[in-house]
Curated annotation (Swiss-Prot):
Belongs to the UPF0502 family. It holds the Pfam family DUF480. It comes from Klebsiella pneumoniae subsp. pneumoniae (strain ATCC 700721 / MGH 78578). HAMAP family: UPF0502. This is UPF0502 protein KPN78578_10500. InterPro entries: DUF480 (IPR007432), WH-like_DNA-bd_sf (IPR036388), WH_DNA-bd_sf (IPR036390).
Length: 217
């Protein structure tokens, strides 16, 4: 798929999507506001500690890739940023309000169950019931221009499967493989393979974050 974000880029875009809906009076965001949003200790998994220079580099990259744009009004000396990731005038990705809420929450908190998504996304969109959440997830998983989410195998002892977004370049293929194996995980060997793939996803993500941190030093 064409959306190939790093974990840090996903965090920046997720923050802008979130603040556009939850605090429209403070949007677009300055660099400092983006730093604060990225490093929030609530509604963020994992919690990050990005520096201003790291965030500025991320913003510059995302502007060049046309996922963000700068905004500078008359008399405003501070450059601000707004997202062009979805629902922009010339962008291809069009999402409903419910889809924006789900995608944003997945970008900010990683894999989650439909129940967790309904609870955590309620500041952005109030789902009428679980069926609506599941319908949105199904739509994102089967879109012709996607898929944008994938269902992970249900963990032992859990009632619901988790869903992961597919906008990051280090997890797309692996998550697709995990999803393909999910219906077969009654077999112990296949379950072990699925768990190994999930572990590889987490390891790749950690290595990418570490590399980005060193590049920013």
């Amino acid at each position: 798929m064409k959306y190939q974000l790093t974990a840090h880029e996903a965090r920046v875009i997720g923050c802008l999507l979130e603040k556009q809906v939850t605090t429209p009076e403070q949007y677009p965001l300055s660099v400092n506001a983006v730093v604060t949003a990225c490093n929030q200790k609530t509604n963020r998994e994992p919690v990050m500690s990005l520096s201003e220079s790291e965030v500025q580099a991320l913003l510059d990259t995302l502007v060049k890739r046309h996922y963000l744009r700068t905004v500078s009004g008359f008399g405003n000396r501070v450059t601000k940023y707004e997202q062009r990731f979805c629902n922009s005038e010339f962008g291809d990705l069009k999402l409903s309000a419910g889809e924006v809420a789900v995608v944003t929450t997945l970008l900010l908190r990683g894999a989650q169950t439909p129940g967790e998504l309904r609870s955590r996304a309620q500041r952005m969109y109030e789902f009428s019931d679980m069926a609506e959440v599941e319908s949105v997830l199904e739509g994102l998983a089967t879109r012709e221009d996607g898929p944008f989410v994938a269902r992970l195998p249900r963990e032992p002892g859990k009632r619901e499967s988790r869903y992961m977004h597919l906008f990051c370049d280090d997890m797309d293929t692996l998550i697709t493989t995990v999803e393909a194996l999910a219906p077969l995980d009654d077999d112990g060997d296949l379950r072990a393979r699925v768990e190994a793939l999930e572990g590889e996803v987490a390891e790749l993500k950690a290595r990418l974050d570490s590399l980005l941190h060193h590049l920013g030093d």
